[in-house]
Every structure is written in structure tokens, then in C-alpha cells.
Amino acid sequence: MRELVKLVCTECGDENYHTTKNKKTTPDRLEMSKYCPRTRKYTLHREKK
């Protein structure tokens, strides 16, 4: 079953994005390079615990 997760910017701490993930196939935390509107650049976004 897919679960909704929030992605948090590692530089400013904002929750800019949300996505779904399958916990059976990807048990570890997601890390994606996404655009952060506050810092106005692409930064690493990690899954919020």
C-alpha cells in the first residue's frame, strides 16, 4: 500500500513537496533533488519522519 510522505528541504527546512511511496519496496527514506522556492535553487529534499 502506498503512503503519503512529505519532503523537507535540507537547507531551509520548509515542507515544499508531498508524494507517495511504497514502503515495501523502498523502506528507507526518500531523497530527491527538488526546487526550493525560498532559496531559489535546487536542493536536496528528504522524507520527513
UniProtKB/Swiss-Prot annotation:
A Pfam match: Ribosomal_L33
Gene3D superfamilies named among the record's database cross-references: Ribosomal protein L33
Residues in the signal sequence: none
Assigned keywords, A-Z: Ribonucleoprotein, Ribosomal protein
Cellular component, GO, one term: ribosome
Biological processes, Gene Ontology terms: translation
UniProt-listed InterPro entries: Ribosomal_bL33, Ribosomal_bL33_CS, Ribosomal_bL33_sf, Ribosomal_zn-bd
GO molecular function, one term: structural constituent of ribosome
Family: Belongs to the bacterial ribosomal protein bL33 family.
Entry-linked PANTHER family: 50S RIBOSOMAL PROTEIN L33, CHLOROPLASTIC (PTHR43168), LARGE RIBOSOMAL SUBUNIT PROTEIN BL33C (PTHR43168:SF2)
Protein name: Large ribosomal subunit protein bL33B
Source organism phylogeny: Bacteria, Bacillati, Mycoplasmatota, Mollicutes, Acholeplasmatales
